[in-house]
Swiss-Prot record:
This is Cardiotrophin-1. One of its GO terms (biological process) is positive regulation of cell population proliferation. Gene3D superfamilies: 1.20.1250.10. Its main location: secreted. Highly expressed in heart, skeletal muscle, prostate and ovary. Lower levels in lung, kidney, pancreas, thymus, testis and small intestine. Little or no expression in brain, placenta, liver, spleen, colon or peripheral blood leukocytes. It comes from the Eukaryota. It is found in: Secreted. GO terms for molecular function: cytokine activity; leukemia inhibitory factor receptor binding. GO terms for cellular component: extracellular region; extracellular space. Belongs to the IL-6 superfamily. Keywords: Cytokine, Secreted. Induces cardiac myocyte hypertrophy in vitro. Binds to and activates the ILST/gp130 receptor.
């Protein structure tokens, strides 16, 4: 009987021993995904600018930083927060981005119907933001630092992206959303890097 009980305990022991390597592998995988998507986000932003016409892309052009409901750029104080809190903010931003990117894609389909690659990039970006956000949330759960309670839906995110009237404001708002997408992916990549061996979490 005692032998049987001992055999039942062995898998638990093995599981506890392998937890750390498994968690490290999960962190590396999520960090690699964030790194790859950051590169894609840079390509998306460059292609978006190229297809909007003048004055977009001109060195002298400084577009207004339109506010986007439900999403802002990473705050200057972000880097000083504990890494788990930073990752919670990253996950929230990644959850807010897909409806914004979807709305920009729909607007660009009207403004640039002959730019299928840009539209495909925007569609992919929305899916990729969802995937990375889910991966970050799963990692937080594995670390025992998941958000408590149901996640709040992004407030009026889609309405914000779709509400710009006129061609120029719509293009500027799309540029802002693509820029925020790149900023938050880069920030997420950096925050995940703090959890890797050699990081300063």
């Amino acid at each position: 009987m005692s032998r049987r009980e001992g055999s039942l305990e062995d898998p638990q022991t093995d599981s506890s021993v392998s937890l750390l390597p498994h968690l490290e592998a999960k962190i590396r995988q999520t960090h690699s995904l964030a790194h790859l998507l950051t590169k894609y986000a840079e390509q998306l932003l460059q292609e978006y600018v190229q297809l909007q016409g003048d004055p977009f892309g001109l060195p002298s052009f400084s577009p207004p930083r339109l506010p986007v409901a439900g999403l802002s750029a990473p705050a200057p104080s972000h880097a000083g927060l504990p890494v788990h809190e930073r990752l919670r903010l990253d996950a929230a931003a990644l959850a807010a981005l897909p409806p914004l990117l979807d709305a920009v894609c729909r607007r660009q389909a009207e403004l640039n119907p002959r730019a299928p690659r840009l539209l495909r990039r925007l569609e992919d970006a929305a899916r990729q933001a969802r995937a990375l956000g889910a991966a970050v949330e799963a990692l937080l759960a594995a670390l025992g630092a998941a958000n408590r309670g149901p996640r709040a839906e992004p407030p009026a995110a889609t309405a914000s992206a779709a509400s710009a009237t006129g061609v120029f404001p719509a293009k500027v708002l799309g540029l802002r959303v693509c820029g925020l997408y790149r900023e938050w992916l880069s920030r997420t990549e950096g925050d995940l890097g703090q959890l890797l061996p050699g990081g300063s979490a």
